[in-house]
Every structure is written in structure tokens, then in C-alpha cells.
């Protein structure tokens, strides 16, 4: 019996040694290969991004690889805490949009236009262009829009008005009922316009003093569906009203930028 117990004990010890040997071997052979303490591309690039921005800027980033170095530079290195870095992927969630309402570090709050209740849970996860809701039937779509107060749907619509008073409305004459009875939120047109505050853009040096400035910027949204993160970006731009410079870490073709 003592012999059998010794065999069992030996087997247990041997098994534990084998289990320990694997991570020890990996650490001894691979530790240096995975040491990133001297790889400074990410924090250096993030620092350059932040330092190149105007004061009190908004930076909209795309995905983790863009965002985490920027957050590291701000929170750990203390670089440009006046800038609000916004991860566009997280804008699809209500809790992240709600964080915009508060001051973070030295960055002032941002107006997301819609209230907490309007974006809660799955509310406004998807917003449809009017023509898509009516299956491409232009006549029905135009009739719906005219009843909602839009006399000429072919003309560009003020972006703030569209997002606040139409896409942000739960009024029965600005929504359509789905098959299960829930309201479908709608945006009237892809053609939008952003009025330019000429005096403000000269004052905050968005443009040079001798530059000519248009009275509005017009663009066309290249798709008939706005997901919550797309709509949130449009809301940020519309509500900003040229008070803060807005930067993107890469082109955003999904919204026609």
C-alpha cells in the first residue's frame, strides 16, 4: 500500500511539474519577443494626432486600434485633456452616447440632441429614409412627408432640424408603424445642409480672415439606413454649430464625408 501511495504522489508531482514547465518555457523563450515597452509608434502617433488639433476639439475615431492609443496618451501621459475622443463604434450604445453629456477631464459636454429616453436600449438603433419605408414608392413617401410638413423633399434639409424634429420625433405623423406595432423612426431625405456661422468660423480661426466662406455646407448621405452610431455622429455635427473643431482619424464614406 505505501508503494501504491508513492506512485500516486509521484504521478501528481510529475503532472504539476509538466503544467508548470509549459508557461515557464514560454516565458523564458518568448518574453523578450513580446516586450512592447520600447515600441512607441502607437503612443507617439496618438500624441501627434492630439497635439495637431485645435483647442477644445472633438476627435472621432474608428475602432480600438485608433482609439486606445489616444485614450492612453490622454489618461496616462496627460496629453491634451481638453480634447474629446469619441469612439464611433461605441456610439451604437445608449450608455456611451450618454457619457457625451458630461464634462470629462478638461473637455466640455457635447450635445447629442436626443434625450436619454429617446436612445434607451434599442430605441433608434436604426432610422430609415422615408422612401425605403414605403418600398421605393415615391408617391407614398412624398405624401407622407407633405403631411409631416415637408413641402419639397427634393431640397436639402437643415441637418439639425432633420435629426431633432424628424428623426428624433415619436409623433404619429412623423413615424410609421411596423408589423409588430412599434414605431419606425424616419429621416426625410439624404440631402442635408449645415448652415455656416460665418462670424464664428472667422473668430475661432476655422478659416483665415481673408477666405471666402459659403453660407452653408451641403452633402448627401449615401445610404437609406442610419444606424445609431451614424445618427449620433450627425447629431454631434449638427448640434456643434461650429463652436468646436471636429476631426476624423480616417475618412467616413458611410456618411458621405
Task: Label every model-predicted segment.
Residues 1-56, 71-257:
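ER/secretory pathway lumenal C-terminal domains and tails of membrane proteins involved
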Amino acid at each position: 500500500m505505501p508503494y501504491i501511495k508513492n506512485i500516486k504522489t509521484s504521478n501528481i508531482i510529475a503532472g504539476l511539474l509538466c503544467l508548470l514547465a509549459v508557461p515557464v518555457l514560454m516565458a523564458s523563450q518568448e518574453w523578450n519577443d513580446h516586450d512592447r515597452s520600447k515600441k512607441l509608434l502607437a503612443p507617439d502617433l496618438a500624441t501627434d494626432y492630439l497635439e495637431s488639433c485645435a483647442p477644445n476639439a472633438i476627435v472621432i475615431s474608428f475602432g480600438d486600434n485608433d482609439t486606445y492609443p489616444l485614450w492612453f496618451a490622454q489618461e496616462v501621459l496627460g496629453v491634451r485633456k481638453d480634447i474629446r475622443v469619441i469612439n464611433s463604434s461605441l456610439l451604437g450604445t445608449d450608455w456611451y452616447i450618454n457619457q457625451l453629456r458630461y464634462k470629462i477631464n478638461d473637455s466640455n459636454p457635447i450635445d447629442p440632441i436626443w434625450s436619454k429616453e429617446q436612445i434607451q436600449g434599442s430605441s433608434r438603433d436604426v432610422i430609415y429614409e422615408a422612401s425605403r419605408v414605403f418600398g421605393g414608392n415615391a408617391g407614398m413617401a412624398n405624401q407622407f412627408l407633405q403631411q409631416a410638413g415637408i413641402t419639397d423633399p427634393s431640397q436639402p434639409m437643415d441637418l439639425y432640424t432633420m435629426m431633432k424634429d424628424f428623426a428624433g420625433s415619436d409623433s404619429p405623423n412623423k413615424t410609421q408603424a411596423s408589423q409588430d406595432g412599434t414605431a419606425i423612426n424616419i429621416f426625410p431625405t439624404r440631402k442635408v445642409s449645415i448652415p455656416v456661422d460665418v462670424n464664428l468660423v472667422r473668430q475661432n480661426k476655422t478659416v483665415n480672415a481673408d477666405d471666402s466662406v459659403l453660407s452653408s455646407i451641403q452633402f448627401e448621405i449615401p445610404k437609406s439606413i442610419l444606424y445609431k452610431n451614424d445618427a449620433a455622429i450627425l447629431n454631434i455635427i449638427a448640434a456643434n454649430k461650429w463652436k468646436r473643431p471636429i476631426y476624423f482619424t480616417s475618412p467616413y464614406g458611410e456618411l458621405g464625408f
